[in-house]
Amino acid sequence: PIYACTEYDTPAEIADDGTTNTGISTKIHRKVLWINIDGAVGEVVKNSLPADGAIAKMLKNSKYSWTGVSDNRTLSVERNEDPVTWATMLTGVIPEKHSITDESYTANVEYNPNNPNEKVIHYQNIISYISNNDVNMLSLCVTPWAKLNKNMLNNAKTTITSENDVQTRDVVLNHIANEDYTFILADFSGML
């Protein structure tokens, strides 16, 4: 099956972001904090969260999903960096569509050079989508994967290759405190 996080309940606290009867705008400026834990499917993370932890406290005011398009993917050989899964998560389409197979993060698409009118479809990743559609939407990506950062997340305003999970956490918290990012992607190898 194919999953995506397009259907979820909106918490009552954030459901209405229009204007009140007083005419004062209550428009909420939505932000995205994408926390990725390498190798962990959503249900495992959900069941491992401490009830009093920071993430659990954020959930009541959040839209989120514990299911993703890569949850059913298993690797025949475990690798440090998994370009196929990253491309699947960041483009929102299955590997057979995005055709990314290696750390170049370039689609491996076959086309006929004798047919200049042949249509080749490339799937934009979320960072490219953000940077191409609103230059004022600032994005931060912190992962330990240098090739992912260089080849797929390079359109973010700030992309940082971290040395470990503690550095990822500290960098993200520092940027949250000091800058106004609309989208933040933080990648961890485990649950701190």
Model regions: which residues?
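Catalytic-adjacent loop/helix segments of enzymes that bind and process anionic phosphate/sulfate esters
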Residues: N117-Y123, D134-V135, L140-L192
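Active-site-proximal beta-strand/loop segments in catalytic clefts of secreted hydrolases
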Residues: I35-A40, V69-R73, G92-V93, E103-Y105, ...
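Loop/turn elements at helix/coil->beta-strand transitions in domains of secreted/extracellular proteins
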Residues: I28-L33, A56, K60-T67, V84, ...
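Active-site nucleophile/metal-coordination loop of metallo-enzymes that catalyze phosphate/sulfate
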Residues: E13-K27, G42-Y129
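Boundary/entry segment of secreted carbohydrate-active catalytic domains
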Residues: H29-W34, D38, V44
